[in-house]
Regions:
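Substrate-binding surface in catalytic domains of secreted glycosidases
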Residues: 23, 97-167
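Conserved, mostly hydrophobic/aromatic
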Residues: 13, 90, 147
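Generic structural signal for well-ordered alpha-helices
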Residues: 32-37, 73-80, 104-111, 137
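Glycan-recognition patch characteristic of GH18 chitinases/ENGases
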Residues: 1-75
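Helix C-cap/helix->beta junction micro-motif
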Residues: 42, 83, 116-119
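Receiver (REC) domain switch/active-site residues of two-component response regulators
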Residues: 11, 86, 145
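Mature extracellular/periplasmic domains of secretome proteins
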Residues: 2-7, 77, 134-143
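A cross-domain feature marking catalytic cores of carbohydrate-active enzymes
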Residues: 17, 48-52, 92-94, 123-127, ...
């Protein structure tokens, strides 16, 4: 709770709680119901973040199979509901060009399940460039509730000037 003391103007917090852990679509969760309850008591929504860079996984292997995507989606939604979070924030990075269509299909399928369970779906993205066009931001905008562009390089850990690392 002390992290949020004095914070104003914020309505969503997205803790990194879900980590892809193998190539079958399983993940590790470090989510906390108590954290969610505290955030809700402060008027904040909680969107649990899924990442693919904590464990050594092959994202293409997971996304290429309907059964593995279904396993991941079912697990994510069930865990989100068990924790009482308001949404799921997808931060899958370094998705290969070859996996682009499967990635977008995963987002389509996840969006259906999220909507059916009243969960917000947001997707984190690099700044759009030609080399990452396979992330298909137009389609993301159709299926996700929020498409987030991660802007970096404003400040860094050793920077002489304090400030955010992204805006």
């Amino acid at each position: 709770s002390t992290v949020l003391d004095g914070v104003s103007g914020m309505n969503v917090i997205s803790p990194t709680w879900f980590f892809l852990s193998d190539n079958e679509g399983n993940f590790v969760s470090i989510g906390s119901k108590d954290y969610v309850e505290q955030a809700h008591s402060r008027g904040l929504e909680v969107w649990a973040l899924l990442d693919n860079f904590t464990y050594d996984v092959n994202t293409k292997e997971i996304l290429s199979y309907t059964s593995k995507r279904a396993n991941l989606i079912s697990g994510l939604v069930n865990e989100a509901l068990a924790l009482g979070v308001d949404g799921i924030n997808v931060d899958l990075e370094q998705v290969s060009t070859e996996a682009g269509e499967d990635y977008v299909e995963f987002l389509r399928e996840l969006s259906i399940s999220c909507r059916a369970n009243n969960l917000v779906l947001s997707v984190d993205n690099y700044v759009p460039k030609n080399y990452n066009a396979h992330y298909n931001w137009k389609e993301q905008g159709i299926v996700a509730d929020y498409v987030i562009i991660m802007g970096y390089d404003e400040h860094y850990g050793g920077s002489q000037e304090p400030g955010s690392v992204a805006s």
